[in-house]
Design a protein with these regions (language model features):
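N-terminal beta1-alpha1-beta2 submodule of the flavodoxin-like/Rossmannoid cofactor-binding fold
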Residues: 190-250
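Active-site neighborhood of phospho(di)ester-bond hydrolases with catalytic His/Asp-centered motifs
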Residues: 13-15, 37-45, 65-68, 127-131, ...
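Active-site metal-binding motif and surrounding structural segment of the metallo-beta-lactamase
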Residues: 19-66
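Metallo-beta-lactamase
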Residues: 67-189
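Conserved hydrophobic helix-helix packing surfaces used for dimerization/oligomerization
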Residues: 40, 103, 126, 211-213
Length: 250
């Protein structure tokens, strides 16, 4: 929630799968403390983020749904019986005045669906990045951000390098102090690290020089050949060689 002279709910931070709609709405009610929200911004129509739109409208029928043209096309397709009394169709770089907060909408098609847009809070310098900069895992598990973030990136937008590059170019024009993704922790420190990784991944560049050999060996002969190949590579001073048995690795 962004709390200003007008209340705004952002789906990228709060909306959940429909199985958790009641819990989500209770959390919103507690935060608003009796006040009514003015806007619900829909950044991404994937069901794990959009499924609570119907429940939100039922509880707050006066709320204005904010999205782009493609957003509302998909809402009509996903929820054909849904009646939206108030809607605001925004364009690229259009801003929404919330009183002491100003939100700027930046379109990010195909990161990860065609309707995706991210939202930038010009006051607090926060980028609500939709599916961008997310990761798998839980907050109570100590692990390097990059491992599950890389796996998440490959699974969500790995084949959409050009759209990610387009979003990065737009993000470079913003003064970002905080990144709030749909999935995973809020990013607040060393943001250039995360941006540089997304730049590298979306350009399909390797993170380090090396050789990867993936194999499957039913009788062990192919494995023996792979091990011999590794020796040959080492003899030619290629030492960063990693092998993976596809039948036994995750």
């Amino acid at each position: 929630c962004l709390v200003g002279s007008e209340m705004c709910i952002r789906d990228s931070m709060d909306t959940v799968d429909e199985h958790f709609s009641l819990e989500w709405l209770k959390n919103i009610e507690d935060v608003l403390n009796g006040k009514l929200p003015s806007y619900l911004i829909v950044s991404h129509m994937e069901p794990d983020h959009s499924a609570s739109i119907h429940a939100c409208l039922k509880k707050y029928p006066q709320i204005t749904i904010v999205g782009n043209t493609k957003t509302f096309q998909m809402i009509d397709q996903f929820f054909p019986d849904l009646i939206i009394e108030n809607k605001l169709v925004v364009k690229e770089n259009e801003q929404l005045n919330l009183g002491n907060h100003q939100l700027k909408f930046v379109f990010a098609p195909m990161v990860h669906w065609p309707e995706v847009m991210v939202t930038y809070d010009t006051k607090d310098k926060v980028l609500f990045s939709a599916d961008g900069f997310g990761k798998f895992g839980a907050l109570d598990i100590e692990e390097d951000w990059i491992d599950e973030a890389r796996r998440y990136y490959i699974g969500i937008v790995g084949k959409y390098g050009l759209p990610v590059q387009n979003l990065l170019k737009k993000a470079m024009l913003l003064d970002i102090k905080l990144i709030c993704p749909l999935h995973g922790p809020v990013l607040s420190d060393n943001l250039n690290y995360y941006l540089s990784l997304y730049d590298k991944w979306s350009k399909y560049e390797s993170e380090e020089d090396g050789i990867v050999i993936c194999f499957n060996s039913v009788y062990g002969h192919t494995k023996s050949a792979v091990l011999e190949l590794v020796k040959v590579l080492h003899n030619h001073e290629y030492y960063n060689v990693k092998i993976f048995d596809l039948a036994r690795c995750d």
